[in-house]
Amino acid sequence: MSQSNNVTDLARANIRALTPYMSARRLGGNGDVWLNANEYPLGTEYQLTTQTFNRYPECQPKHVIERYAAYAGLPPEQVLVSRGADEGIELLIRAFCEPGQDAILFCPPTYGMYAVSAETFGVERRTVPAQADWQLDLPAIANNLDQVKVIYVCSPNNPTGNLINPADLQAVLALAQGRAIVAIDEAYIEFCPQASVSNWLKDYPNLVILRTLSKAFALAGLRCGFTLANSDIIQLLLKVIAPYPLSTPVADIAAQALSPKGIEQMRQRVSEVRANRAWLQSALQDCACVEQVFTSESNYLLARFTASSSVFNALWDQGIILRDQNKQPGLANCLRITIGTRQECERVIAALAPLPGIDNSNNIDNQSKTHSQTSSIRKGTI
């Protein structure tokens, strides 16, 4: 056995077997129209106001916390800032789940980092597939809460774009009361702010809300997210977060983005994205290769195609990079399209328009069977 193999064998067994989250950048591509990561299509400009970098930053930069708290309508003690919402996902597992004993629960098709974070810490991943309309299966959730410490619900859901029914969210919070944390992932909430549940925090001590500056604030490269919760939970998370989660430049830019001017600019971007989303949704429905375009409350559209692999490759060859969702339960022949500029949306339609429609009844039949088979509860223990 080679020396390198010996070193690899020192790693934990679950890490050796782990399939990492395949981010858009990790998947690569050589395109010039990047519509696969739900980013804002244009760069934002900021000037650093702090030029002193020889000192460590604050663990929780006061200016950032206060500005986000004001934006969210919460007291500062209910806000924690982290390296993206992904770190918030991980912090909840680190704080609440005993490896090899506890579980998290989530409802696919949904965001993949819930599963990866649990795998990394040796925590069971318990899945309760969403119903055919992508709403929560409440009876199945109720029957699978043993040893569950954290329930993740994404609303608007990635990659489907739909909001979860508020009454169902309240039902899950009630089911989990005294048993589990319910983390509502609101990464895309700026595109439908009326649907936020942040005003529920006063009524549900087990509610946690995850937020980010990556989407509507157009700062995906900054890696800055927020966890909103009651102060007791925030204090627990502060015990497990890194001592300096935000660098000084990141905190500087985040504070600028959360200024009154920054928030006004964010809302202007949201209006532009909504207009382009409406245009793209209408145009997609006229393409022969498109079977269905699903309603979205976010900055992307999910569409089912007659032959998604051919469509994906055809656009890839033209420098238009989409996100393939075929491996997600219930999403056979589906691609997710980030809303880009109007020009980028027009390029997508120009590339799709010549592609033929195909009789895909067999594929849809198979899709229905697959969804039916996955409706039973699946458990994965790491």
Swiss-Prot record:
Enzyme class: transferase
GO biological process: L-histidine biosynthetic process
UniProt KW keywords: Amino-acid biosynthesis, Aminotransferase, Histidine biosynthesis, Pyridoxal phosphate, Transferase
Residues modified to N6-(pyridoxal phosphate)lysine: K215
Reactions this protein catalyses: L-histidinol phosphate + 2-oxoglutarate = 3-(imidazol-4-yl)-2-oxopropyl phosphate + L-glutamate
InterPro entries: Aminotrans_II_pyridoxalP_BS (IPR001917), Aminotransferase_I/II_large (IPR004839), HisP_aminotrans (IPR005861), PyrdxlP-dep_Trfase (IPR015424), PyrdxlP-dep_Trfase_major (IPR015421), PyrdxlP-dep_Trfase_small (IPR015422)
NCBIfam families: hisC
UniProt name for this protein: Histidinol-phosphate aminotransferase
Organism: Yersinia pseudotuberculosis serotype IB (strain PB1/+)
